[in-house]
Regions:
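...captures the hydrophobic TM-helix bundle architecture rather than a specific catalytic motif
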Residues: 1-229
Length: 229
């Protein structure tokens, strides 16, 4: 069987030992593959949300009323959500600086930046827990219905924000783990360890940064779709 030159090259590459991501470390390649797959999941969730919202015949709850907090007796629309967004975007900045100083092998600056990112992420999760508790216990919103309008609001809101909050929580755990590892010098010497088997390499911080920036980017879309639309 004689193959055309293009097909022959394809099969030669497929059968050889060449990696699909030439020159890209396996950890970074695997993270990119994971993020692409996660993008499809979040994309399906947001597409489902748009479909449900545009097809329902019941009035959709107004975000400026549902997510308002009262200060001095006056409700301020979306104030908590604005603070949450600011906290998460700030954490993206500290994460980027942590990657930068990590490659410079400035251990303690990297540690404090990772630790600050973890604290900001934990703060975001805490505020999300407060948001959920307010909706559930004060407003009576449930996954199967709510007293403010369309019954589907609760199910899609808790599903999408809960899935994102789970991602943030996982990221916070790993941020604390790697803060400890950086402080202990596990990335500077040849100390074998979990996710840090290659001594003298801060590549793991960059991989963690890819995940964290993805989580922040997803929140921007959630913020636009759920709170501004």
């Amino acid at each position: 069987l004689e193959l055309k030159p293009g097909l022959q090259g394809f099969f030669d590459d497929w059968s050889s030992d060449q990696r699909a991501f030439k020159g890209v470390p396996w950890g970074k390649a695997m993270m990119w593959i994971f993020l692409v797959s996660d993008t499809f999941i979040f994309g399906c969730f947001l597409a489902s949300y748009m479909t449900v919202r545009m097809s329902t015949l019941e009035p959709w709850p107004s975000p400026s009323e549902v997510f308002a907090l009262s200060f001095g007796g006056a409700p301020i629309p979306l104030i908590l959500i604005a603070i949450m967004t600011f906290v998460l975007i700030t954490s993206s900045g500290t994460m980027a600086l942590a990657v930068n100083y990590g490659y410079r092998k400035n251990k303690w600056v990297t540690f404090w930046l990772l630790f600050a990112t973890a604290v900001l992420g934990a703060t975001f999760v805490g505020m999300q827990v407060f948001e959920w508790s307010k909706l559930i216990f004060e407003e009576g919103v449930r996954p199967w219905g709510n007293p403010m309008g369309a019954a589907q609001f609760g199910s899609v809101f808790f599903m999408v924000t809960g899935f994102h909050g789970f991602h943030v929580s996982i990221g916070v755990i790993f941020l604390f783990i790697f803060s400890y590892k950086v402080a202990m010098g596990h990335l500077d010497d040849q100390t074998p360890g979990w996710f840090t088997k290659r001594g003298g390499n801060y590549e793991e911080i960059e991989i963690l940064g890819l995940y964290w920036h993805f989580v922040d980017l997803v929140w921007v879309f959630i913020f636009a779709f759920f709170y501004l639309w």
